[in-house]
Amino acid sequence: MIPLSHGLILAFFLFSLGFVSLVMHKNILFMLISLEIMINSAALALVVVGNYWNQVDGQIMYILILTLGASESSIGLALLIQCYRHFKTLNIDKLSEMNG
């Protein structure tokens, strides 16, 4: 069994990695991937804490978060495809400059 502190440190590291990647990248696709990393790291923290307390609530919440992440990524990818077809770019700075 993985100790609680190791699991939470890993979840914090993954969340921090996703946040830094979200802030640094200008491409919408990479930003979407960074959001998925952050969501999955929060789910990992719930599973680790649930396992520590011998409760299945963390795993149930993981299934809920996994469903939420799948719907978020499918909607995000659909919007990303439409954005690329319309503006021919995925750079967030260039998209914010285009008005109209």
Curated annotation (Swiss-Prot):
Q: Which InterPro entries does the entry link to?
A: NADH_UbQ_OxRdtase_chain4L/K, NUOK/Mnh_C1-like
Q: Name one Pfam family in it.
A: Oxidored_q2
Superkingdom of this entry's organism? Bacteria
Q: Which GO terms describe its biological process?
A: ATP synthesis coupled electron transport
Q: Quote the Gene3D superfamilies the UniProt record gives.
A: 1.10.287.3510
Q: Where in the cell is it found?
A: Cell membrane
User: Keywords assigned by UniProt?
Assistant: Cell membrane, Membrane, NAD, Quinone, Translocase, Transmembrane, Transmembrane helix, Transport, Ubiquinone
Q: What GO cellular-component annotations does this UniProt entry give?
A: NADH dehydrogenase complex; plasma membrane
User: How does the protein associate with the membrane?
Assistant: Multi-pass membrane protein
GO MF annotation list: NADH:ubiquinone reductase (non-electrogenic) activity; quinone binding
The record's catalysed reaction(s) read: a quinone + NADH + 5 H(+)(in) = a quinol + NAD(+) + 4 H(+)(out)
- The regions listed as transmembrane in this protein's record are 4-24, 28-48, 60-80
Q: Does the keyword Transport apply?
A: yes
Give the EC number(s) listed in the UniProt record. 7.1.1.-
Tell me, how does this one assemble?
NDH-1 is composed of 13 different subunits. Subunits NuoA, H, J, K, L, M, N constitute the membrane sector of the complex.
Functional summary from the UniProt entry = NDH-1 shuttles electrons from NADH, via FMN and iron-sulfur (Fe-S) centers, to quinones in the respiratory chain. The immediate electron acceptor for the enzyme in this species is believed to be ubiquinone. Couples the redox reaction to proton translocation (for every two electrons transferred, four hydrogen ions are translocated across the cytoplasmic membrane), and thus conserves the redox energy in a proton gradient.
Q: Which HAMAP family does the entry mention?
A: NDH1_NuoK (MF_01456)
Q: Which family does it belong to?
A: Belongs to the complex I subunit 4L family.
Protein's name in the database: NADH-quinone oxidoreductase subunit K
Taxonomic placement: Bacteria, Pseudomonadati, Pseudomonadota, Gammaproteobacteria, Enterobacterales
Name the gene behind this protein. nuoK
